[in-house]
């Protein structure tokens, strides 16, 4: 009797897993459509660019197929449709991301939000230091080493960065320490270019060393005032943030 029961349980588990996957797929499609609708309202050039790119690639593929003739013509058409759809989706994703960053620019907690959305093996600790004016320093551990990212008034953030670098250097030894101020002033990194700036830093330590550094710095905790920092941009960009999350999943 055990075997039939196990077989029935296994079948039920598979059916439940399939139902969960289908439900998740439906939810992703609904989120993607919502993201597209929101972006289309924000960006009047989105549809012309997407349609233009799709038609251009399909037309080029058809032209190549007709020129080559034979079986190639029948393979180039579906290939062109797939490639055109892919390029159109890439255009949508890039423009949606640009809109999200534009709306978040200058808002309190925007840098922390951007760091939280980093792709890759980054270890982010938001608000390791802050002031009562909502200036903040966030700590990132990655292959480059330790990176401190400040947001707010540069005059108030620079002393915070110096303090964090000093007390961190005592624990990490020769691991490189970088500091960045997010903003549009001289020597600052715009919010939209923060991820690109981080990924262009040299890889100085291994993933194993990252674990060691993270363990050492965990004991530091956060300085006074860090708790007043919000964990993301102000609520006005909540809907547009879902655009970026959905596009990233796809």
Swiss-Prot record:
Transmembrane domains' residue ranges: 51-71, 73-93
Where it sits in the cell: the answer is:
Cell membrane
- The reply on keyword Protease is no
Regarding the membrane, this protein is recorded as: Multi-pass membrane protein
Alphabetically sorted, this entry's keywords are: Cell membrane, Membrane, Signal, Transmembrane, Transmembrane helix
Which domain of life, per UniProt?
Answer: Bacteria
Kindly indicate where the leader peptide sits in this chain.
1-19
**Which intervals of the chain are annotated as region Disordered?**
226-250
What protein name applies here?
Uncharacterized protein MT2276
Native species: Mycobacterium tuberculosis (strain CDC 1551 / Oshkosh)
Q: What is the lineage of its organism?
A: Bacteria, Bacillati, Actinomycetota, Actinomycetes, Mycobacteriales
